[in-house]
Amino acid sequence: MTLKIAIAGAGGRMGRQLIQAVHSAEGVELGAAFERKGSSLVGTDAGELAGIGHLGVAVSDDLESQKDKFDLLIDFTRPEGSLEHIAFCVANNKKMVIGTTGFDQNGKAAIKAASDKIAIVFASNFSVGVNLVFKLLEKAAKVMGDYCDIEVIEAHHRHKVDAPSGTALSMGEHIAKTLGRDLKTHGVFCREGITGERKRDEIGFSTIRASDVVGEHTVWFADIGERVEISHKASSRMTFANGAVRAGKWLENKANGLFDMTDVLDLNNL
């Protein structure tokens, strides 16, 4: 049975890549594509919007009218829109892949509550490489973390609206958890003026926003006389889109539950 996938935010940079990824993947098909209410893209063919030719799927701004056309919704939009989509998917028993970042604690709690009813993969980054980096960071933190200074440096395009990136925060969380620290109290997100000497147990974050950078993350484990750097650089959004489709296919036989890419890629067994 073919899994029918819908894309939220179909007209955005990520949405168009997701349409391409669904179209090129085996075992899935594009069932619906959505944009915000009143968008000028409503009625446009999703395939033509994504540059892959006519697909016969018109962009809609009404999930209710399209609910019989898809089994799973992939959502890389903004928190306020994603929360509306989550409520719809719970009410209509639709699975979700959520790549939206910038949720506050209430938003994350809503995702957790929804997963009692439907199956959700929620991740800050759907790149296979980034998720492998998460595991490498845990191993590096276990060996070096208590004896060095840890800094997370990230760069993205000028249009990104949240900082630090969700991926950078996830990196910090993986490190903090390994070291038994709370990122809320040990994370340092801004340094300016007379800050005093750096504390050993800090996890620092630096953010760059410039041009069309897709996404770059580097973590320093810096000790006196040596420094280990673990980096990931994305050159195309297709790596995230392909990962999201892979996650959707993995969810196909799941009734409910909250998962991330560690589950999809079985990284806990590394």
From Swiss-Prot:
The keyword Nucleus does not apply. Belongs to the DapB family. Catalyzes the conversion of 4-hydroxy-tetrahydrodipicolinate (HTPA) to tetrahydrodipicolinate. It catalyses: (S)-2,3,4,5-tetrahydrodipicolinate + NAD(+) + H2O = (2S,4S)-4-hydroxy-2,3,4,5-tetrahydrodipicolinate + NADH + H(+); (S)-2,3,4,5-tetrahydrodipicolinate + NADP(+) + H2O = (2S,4S)-4-hydroxy-2,3,4,5-tetrahydrodipicolinate + NADPH + H(+). Its main location: cytoplasm. This is 4-hydroxy-tetrahydrodipicolinate reductase. (S)-2,3,4,5-tetrahydrodipicolinate binds at residues 157, 166-167. InterPro entries: DapB_C (IPR022663), DapB_N (IPR000846), DapB_N_CS (IPR022664), DHDPR_bac (IPR023940), NAD(P)-bd_dom_sf (IPR036291). HAMAP family: DapB. NADP(+) binds at residue 36. Gene3D superfamilies: Dihydrodipicolinate Reductase, domain 2, NAD(P)-binding Rossmann-like Domain. The gene is dapB. Its EC number is 1.17.1.8. Keywords: Amino-acid biosynthesis, Cytoplasm, Diaminopimelate biosynthesis, Lysine biosynthesis, NAD, NADP, Oxidoreductase. GO terms for biological process: diaminopimelate biosynthetic process; lysine biosynthetic process via diaminopimelate. Pathway: Amino-acid biosynthesis; L-lysine biosynthesis via DAP pathway; (S)-tetrahydrodipicolinate from L-aspartate: step 4/4.
